[in-house]
UniProtKB/Swiss-Prot annotation:
Function as written in the Swiss-Prot or TrEMBL entry: Probable substrate-specific adapter of an E3 ubiquitin-protein ligase complex which mediates the ubiquitination and subsequent proteasomal degradation of target proteins. May have a role in synapse differentiation and growth.
Name assigned to this protein: Kelch-like protein diablo
GO annotation terms (biological process): negative regulation of synaptic assembly at neuromuscular junction; protein ubiquitination
Species of provenance: Drosophila ananassae
Bias (Low complexity) ranges: 26-45
């Protein structure tokens, strides 16, 4: 037998020291025998202690196997030393397991409480099904939280001080938030001291107040909770008139019991911020307001504020302070696309403040696979396919006049399924296809010169590519090289006129949606080799990594993605069987998508762009214009 690695094999061969000893020299002892008086002491004359052989091992299976065996013992009622009586149901368990998992049980079984000496313990004020689920979790580390059990699980987890389950229940409820239930979730969170859930439910309620005020939950609010909501500076409303109307709807739901609360509630409506016409004609003439002296005083205060502008500096207070909702004043345009078997020219505008879609002037050409971007407060529609031909023409929309112009220079190549974005005052057209081949060409438009010029091509041909601008770079994301969908990503540096690869997405995607939101690049939907996708992920440029987020509610290929007033909207697309006109919005705090209405038209491969709301009403079309446009499409 030879020496083990690290030994020198000196002296007497295998045993070392020339004595035919009983084993090999161990690695790390420098080949010197440590037995007998003849052991080497080294150059210092001091005996060097041996380095013992070691193999460290931590079992990954052990915790799972142990828990599984303990759970089997429980189910067979073996070695159980306590029975929990919950609502007449008896649950067998082991004190040590319960104490290790729950501070509540630890205090019960290790202290001087009477229960520490009992073999059967009655637990009150807890649902027996919830208790059984929680005991199962203690033994299996697994639990399913769903709509049917969360309202009993969360109180039970709070009582037993199972913090992990509390957090899971709160996370589940965050994902369920919508305008019809957020007030109930808010109250539930408040009752059970779930501060983070309460904060998020509050924020959701404030941001979506215009929809929340229409819900039945709003009409059923206790007066204290109503006041908590309407006194917030963060209430997202178009005008204070909405707050007054919401309060009066709540009051008139049960006038007999609630009219006594009108002065308390009305003092939190910022009457001085109302228009004079509404203050006098609606508030001042309301019989319930006029019949209460305190309410009349509030109306008089508001009148004085409006009539005496020179005195306003002396009249400042909570009721004169404007509310501060998150970013406002942006609208979303959905442009062209494919609908009912043909390309379309129709364009519509979405205002999140009214949650309403309205038709605006159509383009002069039908365009599917069109690239859309906003430059200098004008909306550009680049290329596309009109149902017969690939296009290089461009149209430009002015929201102030509600008109499209065709005086923009065409691109050097015809392009459909093209990515379009704005960087440093230039409009970039990236990739696409020209009817002959998939393109890696990139060109940019100078609005001052009305001229396109080519820049460095991408390293990969890409049609159905998504583009985004972040940190001074232009990103080209996914698409197809003409053969298969791509997950690769590259970015363009205009200072060096060069494309460089960055980390790929986790999923191959063509015809995906892409937008920059909170310093991340979001990529959603699209199509892989097999099917349309609902999955979504986001890119962090600081770490050069992609991470998944929750999937959309629908599969969407050819989807538009845009950020409007601080919210991320996914618009239209194709789910594999139908063209979509539905819209969904993503909340990064809850990591949740929710449906929020529909366009007038179904759109696959349409473009989206975001602009400041126009200052005039010229962009609003009458019903007859809508019908004419529908006929033209």
């Amino acid at each position: 037998m030879g020496d083990l690695p690290g030994s020198t094999g000196g002296g007497g061969g295998v045993g070392g020291g020339g004595n035919g000893g009983g084993g090999p020299t161990i690695a790390g002892t420098n080949g010197n025998s440590t037995t007998g008086p003849g052991s080497s002491t080294g150059s210092t004359g001091l005996e060097r202690p041996p380095s013992p052989a070691r193999l460290s091992h931590t079992s990954e299976k052990h915790p799972k196997v142990t828990l599984s065996e303990l759970n089997m013992l429980r189910r067979h009622r073996e070695l159980c030393d306590v029975v929990l009586n919950v609502g007449g149901r008896k649950i067998f368990a082991h004190r040590v397991i319960l104490s290790a998992c729950s501070s509540y049980f630890c205090a019960m079984f290790t202290g001087e409480l009477e229960e520490s000496r009992q073999t059967e313990v009655t637990i009150r004020d807890i649902d027996e099904n919830a208790m059984e689920l929680l005991i199962d979790f203690c033994y299996t580390a697994h639990i399913i939280v769903e709509e049917s059990n969360v309202q009993t699980l969360l109180p039970a987890a709070c009582l037993l001080q199972l913090v992990e389950i509390q957090d899971i229940c709160c996370e589940f409820l965050k994902r369920q938030l919508d305008p019809t239930n957020c007030l109930g979730i808010r109250a539930f969170a408040d009752t059970h001291s779930c501060r983070e859930l309460l904060r998020i439910a509050d924020k959701f309620t404030q941001h979506n107040f215009q929809e929340v005020m229409e819900s039945e939950e709003f009409l059923l609010l206790p007066v204290g909770q109503l006041v908590d909501i309407i006194c917030s500076d963060e209430l997202n409303v178009r005008s204070e008139e909405q707050v007054f109307n919401a309060v009066m709807s709540w009051l008139k739901y049960n006038v007999a019991e609630r009219r006594q609360h009108l002065p308390q509630v009305l003092q939190h409506v910022r009457l001085p911020l109302l228009s004079p016409k509404f203050l006098v004609g609606t508030v001042g003439s309301d019989l319930l307001v006029r019949s209460d002296e305190a309410c009349r005083d509030l109306v008089d205060e508001a009148k004085n504020y409006l009539l005496l502008p020179q005195e306003r500096p002396l009249m400042q207070g909570p009721r004169t302070r404007p509310r501060k909702p998150t970013r406002r004043g942006e609208v979303l345009f959905a442009v062209g696309g494919w609908c009912s078997g043909d390309a379309i020219a129709s364009v519509e505008r979405f205002d999140p403040q009214t949650n309403d879609w309205k038709m605006v002037a159509p383009m002069s050409k039908r365009r599917c696979g069109v690239g859309v971007a906003v430059l200098n407060d004008l909306l550009y529609a680049v290329g596309g396919h009109d149902g017969q031909s690939y296009l290089n023409s461009i149209e430009r929309y002015d929201p102030q006049t509600n008109q499209w112009s065709c005086d923009v220079a065409p691109t050097t190549s015809c392009r459909t399924s093209v990515g379009v974005a704005v960087l440093d005052g230039f409009l970039y057209a990236v990739g696409g296809q020209d009817g002959v081949q998939c393109l890696n060409h990139v060109e940019r438009y100078d609005p001052k010169e009305n001229k396109w010029s080519k820049v460095a091509p991408m390293t990969t041909r890409r049609l159905g590519v998504a583009v985004a601008v972040l940190g001074g770079f232009l990103y080209a994301i996914g698409g197809s090289d003409g053969q298969c969908p791509l997950n690769t990503v590259e970015r363009y540096d205009p200072r060096h006129n060069k494309w460089v690869a960055v980390s790929p997405m986790s999923t191959r995607r063509k015809h995906l949606g892409c937008a920059v939101f909170n310093n991340y690049i979001y990529a959603v939907g699209g199509r892989d080799d097999c099917m349309e996708l609902s999955s979504a992920e986001r890119y962090n440029p600081l770490t050069n990594t992609w991470s998944p987020i929750v999937a959309m509610t629908s599969r969407r290929s050819g989807v538009g993605l845009a950020v409007v007033n601080g919210q991320l909207y996914a618009v239209g697309g194709f789910d594999g069987s139908a063209y979509l006109k539905t819209i969904e919005v993503y909340d990064p705090e809850t990591n949740q998508w929710r449906l929020c209405g529909c366009m007038n038209y179904r759109r696959l491969g349409g473009g989206v762009g975001v602009m400041r709301a126009p200052q005039t009403e010229n962009y609003m079309w009458c019903e007859n214009s809508f019908k004419q446009q529908a006929t033209s499409n």
